[in-house]
C-alpha cells in the first residue's frame, strides 16, 4: 500500500461515483404491486387525449358509467343560483409568491415565484403552460374525463388579498372551492361537490416548463415524490409507471424536478392518490397542446419515445369534501425544514446528507456575509475545507513519505522472494508468500511506519468531499446564479467548456507533481485520469467544476510546498 495506489484508488472512486450517477441517475424505488392499468383499447393501443383532458383512470374493475343526467347534476333547488357571466381572474399574494385563479372551473392557472427568475429575467412560473383545458385543482370524473363543472363559470362568493371562495350552482351541478394562503405560505384548498361520489381533484401534469439545457442535463430529474409512513420514495417520469397510494400514512405527495416542488399535504377527506403518467405534446414556448395517457411503459410507441413524460396527481375523496394544503416553490432546504411536513426530505443530498447540510449552511453564510456571489462562495468554501483538512492531509503526506523511503528496502525483499513465489509445479508457494509478508511487516515495525497511516486520513476526507460535491448538484441556490465573465448560471454547464478543460489540465499537472509508480499499468491509468475527468465534467454544472478546479489548484500549491520542503531536507 503506497501513496500512488491510494491516489489512484481515490481518483477511480470519484470517477466511479460520477459515472454511476451518469449511467444510473435514479435508483428505482421498491415496486408496489399495482393492478393492470386500464385506459387502453382492446388491442392495447395508447389513448390520446386533448390538452387539458385527463387520462382514463387505471386500476381495478371498471365502474359503470353514470347516466348523463347524473354526471351533469342539476342545480340544487335549495340553494340560490350561482353562475358568473364571464371569466374572471383572482390574484392571491403572499410575500414573494403570486397565485392566480380563474373562475372557469375555479382552477389555479398561474403560480409565480417573484424571487426566482427564468434565464431571460422574468419571474418563474410553476404552473406548466398549456393551451387550455385542465389546470391544477380541476375536477375530473371516475374515468378521469373532465366533469362539466370543470368548464363552468363559478361565481365569486367572497375574496380578500389572501383568499377566495368560488361557488357554482346551476345546470352543470353544484360545487364550492375555497383557496387561501396560510401563515406558512402554503396554498390551502377545500373543495366540496355535494350529491355525487364520482369526482376527483387533478393537479399537474408536472411542474414548470423545463429549459432545453435542463432537459439535456444528466443532473436534472423530473419525478413524483411521496412520503408514506415516513419512507420517502421517488418515481422517475421516464419509468412511466402508475402508482396508487393509500391515504393512511401519507404525509405528502407531489411532482418535482431537481429544483422545484409542487406537493400536496392531505387534510381531511382523502381516500387515495393516483400517480398517473402521461406523455406531453407541446407547441410554441413549450405549452402543452395535448397529453396522452400511459397505461404502461411497454405501450409507448416508437413515435412517442421523444415526448416528454410527466405525472398527473389524481386525488380521490372519501365523500363530498376534500381539504388539503399544497406547497409550490423551490426545494430550498432551510425553507422546507422550517415546515412541519417533512418536505425537506425531497432535497436529495445523497448518502452523506448529514455532512452536506452543514456545508450548505456554511455556503449560505459566506454568500450572505462576505462575497454575495455563489461562485466566489464556492471558492472560499473550498479553501476553508482544505484548511480544516490540512492536519489530516499533512499526516497522510508524512506517512506516505515514510512509505516512499521504505520502497527500496521493500523492493529488495520482494526481489529475494521473486523466484520462490511458485513451486516446481507452478502452483503458488503459500509459505514463501507468508515469509515475505512477515519480513515486510517486520520492516514496518522496525522503522515505525504504519502502512495504513497514509490511507486512513484520506478516507476521513472522502465523506466531506463527496458531500460537498452532492450538495452542489442539489442546491437550488446555484440556479441562475452567476460567477464571473461568461459563467451566468452555476447550475448549468460552461457553454465554452473552458472550466472543465482547465480543470483537466490542473489534474494532469497535479499528477506530474506526484511521483509516478514504477508499474507501467499504474502509470497508464494515471495518464488516462485527466481525460476521464474531462469527459465526466464537460456536461457538469459549472459550480461543480469550479469546486473541483479550485480543489485541484489548492492541491497543486500544497504538493509544491511539500516537494520544496522535501528538497530542502534532502539538500
Segments and roles (model prediction):
Residues 61-68, 74-77, 153-158, 167-168, ...:
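Generic detector of short, locally flexible boundary/turn motifs and exposed helical patches
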Residues 6, 73-76, 82-85, 94, ...:
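Short secondary-structure boundary micro-motifs
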Residues 1-39, 101, 189-192, 212-218, ...:
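Helix-loop-helix
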Residues 89-346:
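Soluble non-transmembrane domains of integral membrane proteins
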Residues 48, 52-66, 75-78, 134, ...:
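Selective for proline/serine-rich intrinsically disordered segments
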Residues 22, 26-122, 126, 130, ...:
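Juxtamembrane extramembrane loops of integral membrane proteins
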Residues 28-32, 36, 53, 57-71, ...:
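A generic alpha-helix propensity feature with a strong bias for hydrophobic helices
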Amino acid at each position: 500500500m503506497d501513496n500512488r495506489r491510494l491516489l489512484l484508488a481515490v481518483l477511480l472512486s470519484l470517477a466511479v461515483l460520477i459515472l454511476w450517477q451518469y449511467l444510473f441517475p435514479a435508483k428505482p424505488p421498491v415496486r408496489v404491486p399495482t393492478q393492470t392499468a386500464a385506459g387502453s383499447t382492446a388491442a392495447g393501443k395508447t389513448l390520446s387525449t386533448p390538452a387539458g383532458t385527463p387520462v382514463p383512470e387505471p386500476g381495478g374493475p371498471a365502474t359503470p358509467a353514470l347516466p348523463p343526467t347524473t354526471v351533469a347534476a342539476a342545480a340544487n333547488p335549495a340553494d340560490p343560483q350561482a353562475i358568473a357571466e364571464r371569466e374572471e381572474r383572482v390574484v392571491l399574494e403572499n410575500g414573494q409568491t403570486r397565485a392566480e385563479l380563474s373562475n372557469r372551473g375555479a382552477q389555479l392557472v398561474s403560480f409565480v415565484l417573484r424571487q426566482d427568475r427564468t434565464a431571460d429575467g422574468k419571474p418563474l412560473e410553476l404552473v406548466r403552460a398549456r393551451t387550455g383545458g385542465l389546470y391544477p385543482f380541476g375536477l375530473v370524473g371516475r374515468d378521469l374525463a373532465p366533469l362539466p363543472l370543470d368548464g363552468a363559470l363559478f361565481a365569486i362568493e367572497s375574496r380578500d388579498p389572501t383568499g377566495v371562495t368560488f361557488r357554482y350552482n346551476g345546470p352543470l351541478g353544484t360545487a364550492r372551492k375555497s383557496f387561501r394562503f396560510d401563515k406558512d405560505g402554503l396554498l390551502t384548498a377545500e373543495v366540496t361537490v355535494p350529491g355525487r361520489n364520482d369526482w376527483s381533484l387533478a393537479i399537474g401534469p408536472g411542474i414548470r416548463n423545463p429549459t432545453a439545457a435542463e432537459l439535456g442535463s444528466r443532473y436534472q430529474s423530473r419525478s413524483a415524490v411521496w412520503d408514506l409512513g415516513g419512507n420517502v420514495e421517488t418515481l422517475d417520469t421516464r419509468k412511466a409507471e402508475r402508482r396508487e397510494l393509500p391515504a393512511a400514512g401519507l404525509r405528502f405527495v407531489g411532482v418535482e424536478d431537481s429544483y422545484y416542488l409542487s406537493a400536496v399535504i392531505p387534510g381531511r377527506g382523502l381516500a387515495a392518490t393516483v400517480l398517473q403518467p402521461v406523455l406531453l405534446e407541446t407547441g410554441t414556448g413549450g405549452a402543452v397542446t395535448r397529453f396522452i395517457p400511459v397505461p404502461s411503459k411497454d405501450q409507448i410507441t416508437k413515435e412517442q419515445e421523444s415526448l416528454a413524460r410527466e405525472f398527473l396527481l389524481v386525488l380521490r375523496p372519501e365523500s363530498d369534501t376534500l381539504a388539503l394544503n399544497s406547497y409550490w416553490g423551490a426545494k430550498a432546504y432551510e425553507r422546507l425544514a422550517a415546515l412541519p411536513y417533512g418536505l425537506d426530505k425531497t432535497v436529495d443530498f445523497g448518502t452523506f446528507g448529514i455532512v452536506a447540510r452543514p456545508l450548505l449552511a456554511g455556503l449560505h453564510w459566506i454568500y450572505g456575509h462576505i462575497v454575495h456571489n455563489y461562485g466566489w462562495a464556492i471558492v472560499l468554501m473550498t479553501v476553508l475545507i482544505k484548511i480544516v483538512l490540512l492536519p489530516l492531509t499533512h499526516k497522510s503526506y508524512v506517512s506516505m513519505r515514510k512509505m516512499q523511503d521504505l520502497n527500496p528496502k521493500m523492493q529488495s525483499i520482494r526481489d529475494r522472494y521473486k523466484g520462490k513465489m511458485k513451486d516446481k509445479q507452478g502452483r503458488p508457494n503459500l509459505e514463501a508468500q507468508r515469509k515475505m509478508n512477515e519480513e515486510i511487516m517486520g520492516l514496518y515495525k522496525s522503522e515505525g511506519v504504519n502502512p495504513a497511516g497514509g490511507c486512513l486520513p484520506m478516507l476521513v476526507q472522502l465523506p466531506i468531499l463527496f458531500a460537498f460535491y452532492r450538495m452542489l448538484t442539489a442546491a437550488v441556490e446555484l440556479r441562475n446564479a452567476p460567477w464571473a465573465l461568461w459563467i451566468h448560471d452555476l447550475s448549468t454547464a460552461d457553454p465554452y467548456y473552458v472550466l472543465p478543460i482547465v480543470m483537466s489540465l490542473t489534474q494532469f499537472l497535479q499528477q506530474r507533481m506526484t511521483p509516478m509508480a514504477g508499474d507501467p499499468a499504474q502509470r497508464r491509468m494515471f495518464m488516462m485520469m485527466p481525460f476521464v475527468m474531462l469527459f465526466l465534467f464537460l456536461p457538469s454544472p459549472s459550480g461543480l467544476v469550479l469546486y473541483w478546479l479550485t480543489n485541484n489548484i489548492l492541491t497543486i500549491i500544497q504538493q509544491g510546498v511539500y516537494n520544496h520542503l522535501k528538497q530542502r531536507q534532502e539538500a
